[in-house]
Amino acid sequence: AEALAALDHFHTGGLRASRELLELAQIRAEDRVLDIGAGLAGPARMLASALGCRVACLEMSPDYCAGAALLNRLTGLEERIEVHEGSALDMPFPDDAFDVVWMQNVGMNIADKRKLYAEIHRVLKPGGRFAFQEMAAGKGATSYFPLPWATDPAENFLVSAEETRSVLGESGFIAELFEDTSDAHLSRTTADAAPSPLTLGV
């Protein structure tokens, strides 16, 4: 499944970021996991193949849902991964349905953060875990459009890390780990963008 990573881990940080989140999430084989904004289900296939857990994917785009289902079949993981078309603000799942909710770079597309986190809290079992990776607005930073997730300011719902943490607390979550990796990400991005030294071929 990881051979598809360039195609199906199209969030910030790609497969590397998914692996880092996996290390923190402490997901067990017996857990039922929900991946919100699953896209082509790359992280879901990573989880299912690495851990043997069952994953439900929630995705708004019918095309992504169809692509995810196809890739699940081609990789032999369709028995462990189910794909649902729907909104993160009105999830088609009962209360207390999942041990873990997984989400990568979805919040900046959603204006109503309180509704989003309330829905996540609703579908989590008591004592369940919410593992997520999110872009955050920097202090005093200016956004230049178009962005990867927004063509103009009306589509951009980026908030600060502090606001995210506050709304999570209001929604009933207790933070076991809330880590700002902005500096590390910036360092990696700068290093990746640096030109390689020129060499002479003889």
Report residues per predicted region.
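C-terminal helical/coil "lid" or tail adjacent to the Rossmann-like core of SAM-dependent
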Residues: F178-V202
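A short acidic, Gly/Pro-enriched loop at the edge of an enzyme's catalytic core
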Residues: L89-V100
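A short SAM/SAH-binding and catalytic strip from SAM-dependent methyltransferases
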Residues: V100-D112
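Conserved alpha-helix/loop element of class I SAM-dependent methyltransferases that forms part
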Residues: H11-A29
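Class I SAM-dependent methyltransferase SAM/SAH-binding core
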Residues: R32-I36, L40-D90
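Short alpha-helix
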Residues: N156-G172
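A short glycine-rich, Lys/Arg-flanked "PGG" loop and its adjoining helix->strand segment in the class I
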Residues: R114-R129
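Short, glycine-/aromatic-enriched active-site segment of Class I SAM-dependent methyltransferases
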Residues: M135-E155
